[in-house]
Design a protein with these regions (language model features):
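Non-heme Fe(II)/2-oxoglutarate
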Residues: 2-8, 12-101
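Catalytic core of non-heme Fe(II) oxygenases with the double-stranded beta-helix
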Residues: 85-87, 96-142
Length: 142
């Protein structure tokens, strides 16, 4: 696992080096705090994440909240036990620093004992969606 973590971290650092932070931050602000970084990570880096999504598929919990969302999710506990690559990306110090700089605010990981600290959301069926919303933190800060 340590080798996987170091490998993913190295690739995240490499990807960040290719991003124009000033321009990306401008786009982020101009687009109501939303930005897409096409091909941020190379396909060989993404492939382990996709394999893990396949492993996690049986753990998808589907739900529907009228007017808000319809889709599925996989819990943090399943990710911790079955998806080391996804977890390494979530915990990447380089990614956290980059995102903090992008949004111009300090970001932190949620505590390990919070079952909602990291989840995989799956919008795979016709009609799946998520409405506009703002997630607030239950911890100190925003």
């Amino acid at each position: 696992m340590r080798h996987l973590t170091l490998s993913i971290e190295r690739e995240v650092v490499r990807a960040i080096e290719g991003v124009d932070l000033v321009e990306t931050r401008r786009c982020y602000r101009d687009q109501n705090e939303f930005v897409v970084l096409d091909r941020f990570l190379t396909q060989p880096v993404v492939d382990p994440f996709l394999r893990e999504v396949g492993v996690l598929t049986p753990d998808v919990n589907r739900n529907y909240v009228p007017g808000h969302k319809k889709g599925g999710s996989v819990s943090f506990y399943a990710i911790m036990s079955q998806a080391p690559a996804i977890l390494s990306l979530y915990r990447s110090p380089a990614l956290l620093t980059f995102l903090s700089r992008l949004v111009d605010a300090p970001l932190m990981l949620c505590p390990e004992d919070d079952p909602h600290s990291c989840a995989l959301y799956c919008y795979t069926q016709p009609g799946d969606h998520i409405g506009f919303h703002y997630d607030t933190s239950y911890y100190k800060g925003k």
